[in-house]
């Protein structure tokens, strides 16, 4: 039975382009995270954060969350701007992408400069998944 590592090895052996790509430093995914805490409060409660990773000179936003009490004050925009700046400056990123569902935040991402690249209806059933991208 073939395993994923064995299948990748066979695929690499038969694809010079893929073999070369796998040997580049941009192939390795590197984490990128930014967080914000409330300015007031005794414990420095989390107000929001962004968790993503950088791969192939692109920032992949995996999760952006802002506490309900901090929404509407621009914190989400500041978090994503900070992550994009770090991605450009620290990793040489040329773009950013995010997947979001229709009940989440596609409008937010469009307001901060992302454009809709693809939509998949019924993924999962009854929900539309959106891929948004932005040049950095």
UniProtKB/Swiss-Prot annotation:
For this protein, the record's Pfam families field holds: Acetyltransf_1
> Signal peptide: which range, if any?
none
Which Gene Ontology biological process is one annotated for this entry? response to antibiotic
- Acyltransferase in keyword set: yes
InterPro entries hit by this protein: Acyl_CoA_acyltransferase (IPR016181), GNAT_dom (IPR000182)
Domain (N-acetyltransferase): residue spans on this chain: 1-136
Q: Which superkingdom is the protein from? A: Bacteria
EC numbers listed for it are 2.3.1.-
Q: Gene3D superfamilies under this entry?
A: 3.40.630.30
Sorted alphabetically, the keyword list is: Acyltransferase, Antibiotic resistance, Transferase
Q: Does the keyword Lipoprotein apply?
A: no
Q: MF terms per GO, please?
A: acyltransferase activity, transferring groups other than amino-acyl groups
Q: Which cysteines are joined by disulfide bonds?
A: none
What this chain does, per the record?
Confers resistance to blasticidin S antibiotic.
The molecule here is called Blasticidin-S acetyltransferase
Q: What phylogenetic lineage does the species belong to?
A: Bacteria, Bacillati, Actinomycetota, Actinomycetes, Kitasatosporales
Q: Which gene encodes it?
A: bls
